[in-house]
Amino acid sequence: MTDAAVSFAKDFLAGGVAAAISKTAVAPIERVKLLLQVQHASKQITADKQYKGIMDCVVRIPKEQGVLSFWRGNLANVIRYFPTQALNFAFKDKYKQIFLGGVDKRTQFWRYFAGNLASGGAAGATSLCFVYPLDFARTRLAADVGKAGDAREFKGLGDCLVKITKSDGIRGLYQGFNVSVQGIIIYRAAYFGIYDTAKGMLPDPKNTHIFISWMIAQSVTAVAGLTSYPFDTVRRRMMMQSGRKGSDIMYTGTIDCWKKIARDEGSKAFFKGAWSNVLRGMGGAFVLVLYDEIKKYT
C-alpha cells in the first residue's frame, strides 16, 4: 500500500472506532432529543401524551417502554455513525489538500479559515449521500414509542428499511435529504473548520494538552450544534412523513414544514431538545479529542 492509502485507512479506522464508542455512551440522550424533536409529527404520540421536556421524557421512557428502550435505534446509529464519521475524517483531509494547498495559516488567516470551513462542509455533505438511509432508519426507530410486538411500528433496522421502501420506494428513505445537506454543511463547517483553525493557531498543536483540546472541541460542538439545530428539527420532521398517505401527511414539503412549525408551534419549537443536544455534544467533543489521540499512536 502507498503512504497515502495507509494514511487514509488510519483516518477511517481511528475516526470510526472513536465515533462508535462515544455514540453508544450518549445514546439515551440522543433518543430523548429525537423524541422531543419529532413528537408533534408522530402518529403514536397523541397531544395528551406528549413529553413536557427533557426530565419528563427521561422519567417516562423506562416506565412506559423499559430501560433498554433508551438504546432504541442505537444499532442503526452505530452502523451509520461508523462510516459517516470515518468518511468525514478521511475526506476532510482530502478536501483540505484541495482547499488549503499552499495556504500559509500565519500570513493568510482568513483564507486558511475559509478553507477549513469548505473542507469540513464538503466532507460532511459527501458522507451524507452514502449513509442517509441509515440515518433515516435510526430516527424512525428512536421515534417508535411502542412497548413491544404489535405496538411497535418497526421490528428493527431491516424491517424499517423494507417497509418504507415498499410503501414509498427508495425516495422514502431520503425524505428530508435536501434540508439535511444544508444543515450538515453548516454543522460540519463549524465542527471541523473552527476546531482545526483553533488548533492550528496553537504554538504546538501536536503536543497540546488533552484538556485544552477537549475545551476547544466542547465549545466547537456546542456552537455548531445550536447553529444547525433548526435544520435538524425540520429534517427529522420530514423523515416522519415517509410511509404516510393522504390526510396523514402533515407537511407537503420542506418549506411547508418550516412555515407550519413556526406558525403552529412558535420559533422555540425549532430548538426542542437543543439542551440535550449540547449534552450529547460532549460525545462529539470526545470523538475529536480521541481521534487526535489515536492518530498519535497509529
From Swiss-Prot:
Where does the sequence pass through the membrane? 8-37, 75-99, 110-130, 179-199, 211-231, 274-291
Keyword Nucleotide-binding among record annotations: no
Please list the residues that bind ADP.
80, 92, 235
Modified-residue entries (N6,N6-dimethyllysine), positions: 52
Question: Is Transmembrane a UniProt keyword of this protein?
Answer: yes
Q: Which residues carry this modification: N-acetylthreonine?
A: 2
Q: Which domain of life is it from?
A: Eukaryota
Segments of this protein annotated with the region Important for transport activity: 235-240
GO cellular component, alphabetical, reads: mitochondrial inner membrane; mitochondrial permeability transition pore complex; MMXD complex
Q: Where in the cell is it found?
A: Mitochondrion inner membrane; Membrane
PTM sites of type N6-succinyllysine: 43, 105, 147, 155, 268
**InterPro entries the record matches:** ADT_euk_type, Mit_carrier, Mitochondrial_sb/sol_carrier, Mt_carrier_dom_sf
Membrane topology, from the record: Multi-pass membrane protein
Q: What's the catalysed reaction?
A: ADP(in) + ATP(out) = ADP(out) + ATP(in); H(+)(in) = H(+)(out)
Among the GO biological process terms of this entry, one is: mitochondrial ATP transmembrane transport
Post-translational modification here is noted as: Trimethylated by ANTKMT at Lys-52.
Modified residue annotations for N6-methyllysine: 52, 147
Residues modified to N6-acetyllysine: 105, 147, 155, 163, 166, 268
The family database entries (PROSITE patterns) matched by this protein are listed as: SOLCAR
Q: Which UniProt keywords apply?
A: Acetylation, Antiport, Chromosome partition, Membrane, Methylation, Mitochondrion, Mitochondrion inner membrane, Phosphoprotein, Repeat, Transmembrane, Transmembrane helix, Transport
Question: N-acetylmethionine-modified residues are where?
Answer: 1
**Which residues does this entry mark as bearing N6,N6,N6-trimethyllysine?**
52
Of which family is this protein a member? Belongs to the mitochondrial carrier (TC 2.A.29) family.
| Domain comment quoted from the record | The transmembrane helices are not perpendicular to the plane of the membrane, but cross the membrane at an angle. Odd-numbered transmembrane helices exhibit a sharp kink, due to the presence of a conserved proline residue.
Q: What is this protein called?
A: ADP/ATP translocase 2
- Origin organism is Tachyglossus aculeatus aculeatus
Gene that produces this protein:
SLC25A5
